[in-house]
């Protein structure tokens, strides 16, 4: 026989494997039995334990009693080192995280070209988080219109505003605008405009704000940018449903373990029976051969 397995959720102590433990049946006293059931199921576990009625086959191991054993003074199991399936893990500032989602900076691409008549053009990437501009060689994607601005710092600010506008209203039509970019501030941009006009105080440029990535909106949680995987929950799954599923899975695993041990025991018993039958057949054959030898 495989022995008894502890019926406490998350505990898989077995009387056949754990020889040093004691296993106790639920008491017959209604009040004491109710206390046992309440403690074992951790305040009403959903799933199988929501309608759990213990029988003689359900045992609680001595690990859940103070001192490691049930006694006259210690009659109720109170030690549960493993977290129950209905016990929520406290998460630090979980409410704060939901109210203020931590977005990654969305990158908006700025296409800087010369005014009509100029052939040079550059593509810059403007990051909303740090307002950094880098040279890139990408193509134009989603468009977002911005107002006329003057100076490189104004371009950054207006572009960030355009990113927010694009996030709220979707992708708008791309528009070309003329700006005056201060050459004295273009050391971080490192443009390829090497005309004589670039040595002056300002340079006439044409800017098109385009974007490669959608900007996550505040009302979208979790963010659609997060890649899905096989263990992720759907948006409609509640914590209670997930806990119920986990509890059912644990009960199924515990049941499967018991069934596997029963099968192993049955296989062992069949092997012993097979050996006995072979021995009996051998003995019968021996008894048949003995009279024939004597007669000869």
Curated annotation (Swiss-Prot):
GO cellular component labels: nucleus
S-S bridge residues: none
GO molecular-function term, one example from the UniProt record: zinc ion binding
Function comment: Transcriptional repressor that plays a central role for embryogenesis and the pluripotency of embryonic stem (ES) cells. Sequence-specific DNA-binding factor that represses gene expression in pluripotent ES cells by directly binding to key genetic loci and recruiting epigenetic modifiers.
A Pfam family matched in the record: THAP
Subcellular location: Nucleus
Native organism taxonomy: Eukaryota, Metazoa, Chordata, Craniata, Vertebrata
Zinc finger (THAP-type): 6-64
Family according to the record: Belongs to the THAP11 family.
Keywords: Coiled coil, DNA-binding, Metal-binding, Nucleus, Repressor, Transcription, Transcription regulation, Zinc, Zinc-finger
Record's protein name: THAP domain-containing protein 11
Residues forming coiled coils: 240-281
Major location (coarse): nucleus
Species for this entry: Xenopus tropicalis (Western clawed frog)
């Amino acid at each position: 026989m495989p022995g008894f397995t502890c019926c406490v959720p998350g505990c898989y102590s077995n009387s056949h494997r754990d020889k040093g433990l004691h296993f106790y049946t639920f008491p017959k006293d209604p009040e004491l039995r109710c206390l046992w059931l309440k403690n074992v199921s951790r305040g009403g576990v959903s799933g199988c334990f929501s309608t759990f009625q213990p029988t003689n086959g359900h045992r609680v191991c001595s690990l859940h009693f103070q001192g490691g054993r049930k006694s006259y003074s210690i009659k109720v199991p109170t030690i549960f080192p493993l977290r129950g399936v209905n016990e929520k893990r406290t998460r630090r500032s979980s409410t704060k995280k939901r109210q203020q989602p931590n977005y990654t900076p969305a990158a908006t691409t700025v296409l800087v070209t010369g005014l009509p008549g100029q052939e040079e053009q550059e593509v810059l990437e403007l990051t909303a988080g740090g307002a950094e501009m880098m040279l890139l060689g990408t193509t134009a994607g989603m468009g977002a219109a911005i107002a006329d601005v003057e100076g490189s710092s104004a371009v950054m600010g207006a572009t960030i505003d355009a990113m927010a506008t694009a996030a709220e209203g979707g992708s708008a039509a791309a528009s070309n605008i003329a700006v005056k970019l201060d050459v004295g501030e273009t050391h971080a941009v490192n443009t390829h405009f090497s005309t004589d006009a670039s040595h002056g105080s300002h340079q006439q440029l044409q800017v098109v704000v385009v974007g490669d990535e959608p900007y996550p909106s505040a009302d979208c949680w979790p963010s659609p940018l997060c890649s899905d995987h096989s263990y992720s929950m759907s948006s409609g799954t509640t914590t209670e449903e997930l806990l119920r599923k986990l509890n059912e899975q644990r009960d199924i695993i515990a049941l499967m373990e018991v069934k596997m041990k029963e099968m192993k025991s049955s296989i062992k018993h069949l092997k012993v029976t097979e050996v006995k039958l072979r021995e009996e057949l051998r003995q019968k054959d021996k008894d048949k051969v003995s009279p024939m030898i004597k007669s000869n």
